[in-house]
């Protein structure tokens, strides 16, 4: 994911240089919280000077719940950004640990619990990503990571592009914009996502469905979402 972020100082802000030398906090999230407080102005300045800052509708902060730097700093930064820019909601995407991390690393569960409790009190919405749920046993670790990242990013692409499409042929009957998203994302949030391939050439009257069949399919889909 970081490969697409520019490497200049405005896009990659190093925090904790004085306390940790920029080498992380060794899973000690309390230290990460201190680092975030000390260097918060560096991050806020980078946000404020961003090219499209005034066009943005909301903030999305992403962190791992099990690590030290992310889990300790994200509640601090969320609170600070909300105080500075109260007119824009701040969302948190929290990545939950793999099962083997919980079994082998002592601080994993503690950091995750502390992180979730902290962000719940400051973020406008929290979206959880369960790494373990996406794991495929027949995939290598590298392929698993790539697949998980793709599954996370795909639904977010459409969500973040809401209201941005300008070509009429891509605009559907029902249009969502940033205001609709802001009104919807509140508290603990789940994003349902689905897609269907549509043939380029459709034969008239072939496989046509009446409204009863469509209604049955909709109810099946709703039931499947409830069970999930």
Task: Indicate where each model-derived feature is located.
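Tubulin/FtsZ superfamily GTPase core signature
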Residues: 1-228
């Amino acid at each position: 994911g970081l490969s697409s972020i520019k490497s200049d100082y405005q896009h990659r802000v190093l925090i904790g240089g004085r306390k940790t030398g920029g080498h992380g906090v060794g899973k000690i999230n309390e230290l990460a919280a201190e680092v975030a407080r000390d260097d918060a102005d560096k991050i806020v300045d980078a946000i404020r000077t961003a090219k499209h800052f005034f066009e943005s509708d909301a903030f999305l902060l992403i962190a791992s719940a099990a690590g030290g730097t992310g889990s300790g700093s994200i509640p601090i930064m969320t609170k600070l950004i909300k105080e500075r820019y109260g007119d824009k909601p701040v969302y948190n995407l929290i990545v939950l640990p793999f099962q083997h991390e919980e079994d082998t690393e002592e601080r994993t569960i503690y950091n995750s619990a502390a992180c979730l409790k902290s962000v719940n009190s400051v973020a406008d919405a929290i979206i959880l990503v369960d790494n373990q749920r996406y794991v495929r046993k027949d995939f290598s670790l590298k392929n698993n990571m790539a697949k998980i990242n793709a599954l996370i990013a795909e639904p977010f692409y459409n969500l973040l592009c809401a209201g941005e499409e300008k070509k009429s042929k891509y605009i559907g009957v029902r249009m969502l914009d940033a205001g609709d998203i802001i009104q919807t994302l509140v508290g603990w949030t789940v994003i349902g996502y689905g897609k269907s391939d549509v043939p380029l050439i459709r034969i008239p009257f072939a496989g046509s469905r009446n409204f009863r069949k469509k209604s049955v399919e909709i109810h099946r889909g709703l039931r499947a979402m409830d069970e999930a």
